[in-house]
Amino acid sequence: MPPPIREQIAEHAREELPNESCGLLLLEDGQAVEYVRAENADASPYRFTLYLDPIRWSEIELDQAVVHSHVSAPPRPSRTDVENIGLWQGRPYLIYSIARDELAAWTIEDGSIEPLQLG
């Protein structure tokens, strides 16, 4: 994970307090190349629904990973994350913990959670 992109994720998370932040990590050949801020349509400290302008989303041609923050919990998928995985099932799923200043990556598929290495 390039340090400038990690810092953009952390900065966005801090700015959205007390709510969770969310966004997209754009990937080229499996490597992070850009962080795109999105809106948490739930405006909640406990859950998120990612909203990105549909026109902006349609312009993205790279692979995508979802990113969201946990305000006080560790950067591990919560039960809510697993139950609401939706279209992110099987894709890289990154969580930034504001309280711990930690970023971790996972895949969630059919209720199974597997860690991913951040490059």
Identify the role of each PLM range.
Residues S69:
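Extracytoplasmic ligand/sensor domains, especially the bilobed periplasmic-binding protein
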Residues M1-D63, S72-G119:
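Conserved beta-strand-loop surface patch within small alpha/beta domains used
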